[in-house]
A protein has these predicted regions:
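Positions in alpha-helical segments
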Residues: 11, 15, 46, 121-122
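C-terminal regulatory/oligomerization modules of transcriptional regulators
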Residues: 1-8, 130-155
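N-terminal leader segment of winged-helix/HTH proteins
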Residues: 1-39
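Charged, amphipathic alpha-helical coiled-coil/dimerization segments
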Residues: 77-140
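N-terminal helix-turn-helix DNA-binding core of bacterial DNA-binding proteins
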Residues: 26-71, 154-155
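Generic structural concept
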Residues: 18-21, 48, 52, 102, ...
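Alpha-helical linker/hinge and terminal dimerization helices associated
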Residues: 17-20, 24, 28-31, 65, ...
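Alpha-helical macromolecular-interaction surfaces
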Residues: 19, 23, 73-74, 130, ...
Length: 155
């Protein structure tokens, strides 16, 4: 069997993960654009998906998202310009800055969470609630194992 046929019939974990991620992102960001958030792109999720309500440090966002701190800094600059976050002094450490969602940012996060919950519910209905719950349980294990392997390798 040639490679292109094999990747269609029996895609590996990376291909399946990528297809799932990109498909979810297309659906999510199209819905968000219709709901008043047309300027955001999937890359902004590295900040907004991991941002605490009361703010997060850029170093924490980098660790949670797996992105380099410089990438997070660039994304935060874009999100500040778009009006989704602001930088504030961290009351716990006046030298540090917190990235805090604005009202627009909080609206985006609430809408995003609701859309993703509906997408997940639709998948659960399609494959069965129990099968979907088991899929998520196993996928979390695989993701955690992969993260541990990556961190053990020093990357």
């Amino acid at each position: 069997m040639d490679r292109s046929r094999r990747t269609q019939e029996d895609p590996d974990l990376g291909m399946l993960s990528g297809r799932t991620l990109f498909g979810l992102q297309r659906e999510l960001f199209a819905a968000l654009a219709e709901q008043g958030h047309p300027g955001l792109r999937p890359r902004h999720g590295a900040v907004l998906a991991y941002l605490d309500d009361d703010g997060s440090r850029a170093t924490d966002l980098a660790a949670r998202s797996g992105r380099h701190k410089q990438v997070i800094g660039t994304l935060v600059d874009e999100l500040v310009e778009l009006g989704y976050v602001e930088r504030r002094r961290d009351p716990a450490d006046r030298r540090a800055k917190l990235i805090v969602p604005t009202e627009r940012g909080r609206d985006f996060i609430v809408r995003s969470d609701a859309i993703l919950a509906e997408l997940e519910a639709a998948h659960a209905r399609a494959v069965g609630e129990q099968a979907y719950a088991e899929f998520k349980r196993v996928f979390r294990l695989v993701a955690a194992r992969q993260a541990a392997l990556t961190s053990d390798a020093g990357t």
